[in-house]
Regions:
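A hydrophobic C-terminal alpha-helical subdomain
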Residues: 70-84
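Short, structured active-site "lid" loops
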Residues: 60-70
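Lipid deacylating catalytic domains
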Residues: 1-62, 82-122, 126-285
Length: 285
C-alpha cells in the first residue's frame, strides 16, 4: 500500500512525457524494498504549449538562416513556456489555468490510492514557479480570499467541468497541497518572476504541514537556477538552499560556461537524488 506520493513537475523547454522516468528509476534503486510504498506520478503540461512552439521553430528553420540551433530552440521553447503561462492568465482556459489543471489531475490520481498520504513535490526550472503559484493560489482560496487566475478561482466549477462531479473535502485538501510534507526545487527561477515586484508583494507559500521541508538545489554556474533564501518576505526561514554541481564538473572552459545541459542535469546529480530518496524513506518508513 502506498504511504507517500512523489509528484514531479517539469521545467522549461521541449519536454517528453517520460521526462521523470530516469529520476524515478534512480529513486527506486535507492529506496529498495520501500519503493513499493511510494506512488510516483509526473505532471505534464508541456503538451499545452509544444505544438505551437514546434510550428514557430519549423517555420524559422525553413525560411531563415539562424545560428546556434540547439541553444536557440531551447530559448524559444523555454521562454515561450514562461511567456505563455503568464500572458493573460486571468482568461478562462488560459495556459496558466490548463497547467494548474494538469497538477490537480495528477494529484487526484495519487489521492485515489490513499487519501491523506503525505506528498513530496519535486519541481525543476519553470516548474518551480508553476507549482509555487498553484500552491499559493490554493492556500489563498482556502483562506476565503479571491484568486485572480487559475483553477482555484473557482475550484468547484473546475471540478465539474474537468471530472464531472464535485470534489470531496478530502480531495480538495489534497489538491490544495494540504498534505505536502516536502518540496524539492532544482534549477529554480522563481526570482526571475518576482524580481520586478515591490518588496511588500513578494510573498512565498505558507508551510502546508508541520513536517514541511523545502530544499532548493542550485548550481552557481546555472544562470537559470537561483538561490531562494536571499528573497524577502520569509523565504530565508522557509527554504534551505543547497549548492550542487549539476553540470558534472567538466574541464573545458566552454563547457563550464552556461548551457542548457547544465540547467537540465539536476535530476542526474547523486546529491539531489539522495536527498529526495531520504525524504521519501523518512515518510514511508
Amino acid at each position: 500500500m502506498a504511504d507517500v506520493a512523489l509528484i514531479t513537475v517539469h521545467g522549461m523547454g521541449e519536454t517528453p512525457p517520460t521526462y521523470a522516468d530516469g529520476l524515478m528509476d534512480r529513486l527506486r534503486g535507492q529506496l529498495g524494498s520501500l519503493a513499493g510504498q511510494v506512488v510516483m506520478r509526473s505532471v505534464y503540461y508541456q503538451k499545452i504549449l509544444q505544438d505551437n512552439q514546434n510550428y514557430v521553430w519549423e517555420r524559422t528553420r525553413e525560411h531563415s538562416a539562424v545560428r546556434y540551433p540547439d541553444l536557440r530552440k531551447f530559448v524559444l521553447f523555454g521562454f515561450g513556456d514562461a511567456a505563455g503561462l503568464e500572458n493573460r492568465k486571468e482568461i478562462p482556459g488560459s495556459v496558466y489555468e490548463l497547467a494548474q489543471g494538469e497538477i490537480a489531475r495528477t494529484l487526484l490520481s495519487a489521492h485515489a490510492l490513499r487519501p491523506g498520504m503525505p506528498v513530496v513535490f519535486v519541481a525543476q526550472s519553470l516548474g518551480c514557479q508553476v507549482l509555487s503559484s498553484y500552491i499559493y493560489d490554493a492556500q489563498k482560496a482556502a483562506r476565503g480570499q479571491p484568486v485572480g487566475a487559475g483553477i482555484w478561482r473557482n475550484i468547484d466549477a473546475w471540478a465539474l467541468a474537468a471530472i464531472g462531479r464535485a470534489l470531496t473535502a478530502s480531495e480538495k485538501t489534497f489538491l490544495g497541497a494540504g498534505t505536502c510534507a516536502a518540496l524539492v526545487t532544482t534549477g529554480c527561477n522563481i526570482p526571475v518572476f518576482i524580481a520586478a515586484h515591490k518588496i511588500m508583494h513578494i510573498i512565498p507559500i505558507e508551510r502546508p504541514t508541520s513536517l514541511f521541508k523545502w530544499i532548493n538545489f542550485y548550481d552557481p554556474d546555472d544562470v537559470l537556477g537561483w538561490p531562494l533564501q536571499p528573497l524577502p518576505g520569509g523565504y530565508n526561514e522557509l527554504v534551505e538552499d543547497r549548492i550542487v554541481n549539476a553540470s558534472g564538473g567538466v574541464a573545458s572552459l566552454l563547457l563550464r560556461s552556461w548551457n542548457p545541459f547544465s540547467h537540465n542535469s539536476y535530476w542526474d546529480d547523486a546529491t539531489v537524488v539522495a536527498a529526495i530518496a531520504a525524504m521519501l524513506r523518512r515518510l514511508a518508513a
